[in-house]
Amino acid sequence: MDGAGEKRVRAKGSREVDWISNLPETLLCQVLFYLPTKDVVKSSVLSSRWRNLWKYVPGFNLSYCDFHVRNTFSYDHNTFLRFVDSFMGFNSQSCLQSFRLEYDSSGYGEPKLALIRRWINSVVSRKVKYLGVLDDSCDNYEFEMPPTLYTCETLVYLTLDGLSLASPKFVSLPSLKELHLSIVKFADHMALETLISQCPVLENLNINRSFCDDFEFTCVRSQSLLSFTHVADTDEMLNEDLVVAIDAPKLKYLRLSDHRIASFILNDLASLVEADIDTVFNLICKKMFNPNDLNKRNMIRDFLVGISSIKTLIIASSTLEVIYDYSRCEPLPLFRNLSSLRVDFYGYKWEMLPIFLESCPNLKSLVVGSANYREKEGINILSVPRGFLSSLEYVKIERPLKGEAMEMKLVSYLLENSTILKKLTLCLDDSIKKEESVILKELNTIPRLSSACQVVIL
């Protein structure tokens, strides 16, 4: 603290009012609660009133990154561990609202790992509500969470990153509502299934799967779950046939982003409202969609039927390509409730889009994201029957247009086939900003099925 600030805190005769120090201690502790713990401890030098206040803050946020060795790119891990260990001894009988610990266990060895286990056991006994443990050791999985974690009755929020989880003999997490598991190594597939099934009020589940997590079958079964995210790094060197089954009758939001999973089995998702899908059902490593593979076709059909009740959908072009290939064998199910659609293109041809739009009879809003348009011979999107975009009202093409032929074909298709389109929003690339008048002139020559349509250029 600078001299002026220190004078405001300590001077009794000053006209300036130190309104912060005049706050009740309970409120001051809540203010300190939102600061990194190392900064909270520093507040003890402000005045005699602040000297011991940090000991009563109801939450710890401890990170080895706060112990940077000056003029180097390294951290003082030993000082960090000593600091945390001594810190945990203060007011050890009080209840904790939150505890966040970030460390790097590379080279720690058993004595140091035992320290971390002791800290976890301590915060569990102090009835912690919000717990986050992050190991930045680059997938070494040296640290395994102690079994006391599985029976913490007060825990409401839990996030684990870079850790190992044993297969628990007994789980009871009656208060847990939100669970985030990132790059976590499970002892077996039952470890995850048991953990989820014994969280009776779990509402939000977020799983970022590890590259070494190769269980053939993973089941997410929950009667209370409202939101589920399943993400994995796309690694096309892996050629695994993995299955994920989801049984969550109250689920409202679903995000799937994993190209390795061969089959997503969706059971009873009638409550689903919103989905974000980026999967190719393991059609990677030069594996192509095979029309004669009836098992794959049945799985894709069941998957599409499983999400057909949604109102909002974000879908990757890679997924759309699989759906397009499937549609040449069987008709797509109708997405009668779908009113908002976003398609993100990453180097795939957008000509697949109209086939999917045919299955969305009540679509009102369409956003075409980062598309990479490429000329393609032999493709005629205007062969799609006119008027099937009978409900579409708003379209936005976010990728900056460069005036290329395929871009203008997309714009023409939308204008010529949308019965009640109210607004088409386009973005121009900076390289052709000076040619905006030329683009506008070309747009004005395109017939519009909807006379009320307004074209806006950003």
Swiss-Prot record:
Boundaries of every F-box domain copy: 17-67
Keyword DNA-binding annotated: no
Keywords noted in UniProt: Leucine-rich repeat, Repeat
Gene3D superfamilies attached to this UniProt entry: 1.20.1280.50, Ribonuclease Inhibitor
PROSITE patterns referenced in this protein's UniProt entry, alphabetically: FBOX (PS50181)
LRR repeat spans: 152-183, 184-209, 231-258, 302-327, 345-370
Protein name: F-box/FBD/LRR-repeat protein At1g78750
CDD domains recorded: F-box_AtFBL13-like
Organism domain of life: Eukaryota
Organism: Arabidopsis thaliana (Mouse-ear cress)
Cited InterPro entries: F-box-like_dom_sf, F-box_AtFBL13-like, F-box_dom, FBD, FBL13/AtMIF1-like, LRR_dom_sf, LRR_FXL15/At3g58940/PEG3-like
One family name in Pfam for this protein: F-box
